[in-house]
Amino acid sequence: TIGIENRYRYYDLPLPDEMGVLLGLNTDAKYGFQFDTGHAQALEALGLCEKGIWLRRFSDRLIGVHLHDVCGIQDHQLPGEGDIDFGSIARSLPENCQKTIEITPFATSAGITRCLEFLAMSGCIISF
């Protein structure tokens, strides 16, 4: 399976319209959208993407998600320690979606445990 990820910087491809073009090139189920929660939030915070546009437009092609939080525009924070509404994200994730927790290498064991508990409570992961 190949997933095309939304990117962190405004000058990186793809932005939402470009993602639509790329996903339109191949409709095979093994070619889809890899959603990065932090990248989306950072672009929203900068006013470059409207809130929730990525999942509204591409949830039907969603194959995976990178779960991390953002404080302002600083990404790769532990989920639950930033600005992202993970409950609303959880409602858009299909059951077969691959989930990756993508966090700073400076996270502590206790912080990671809190993060996993938070993601379970928000519905992003089944249990911890």
Regions found by a protein language model. Give the residues of each.
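Histidine-acidic metal/acid-base catalytic patches
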Residues: 13-128
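Aromatic-lined carbohydrate-recognition surfaces of secreted/lumenal glycan-active proteins
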Residues: 1-12, 34-35
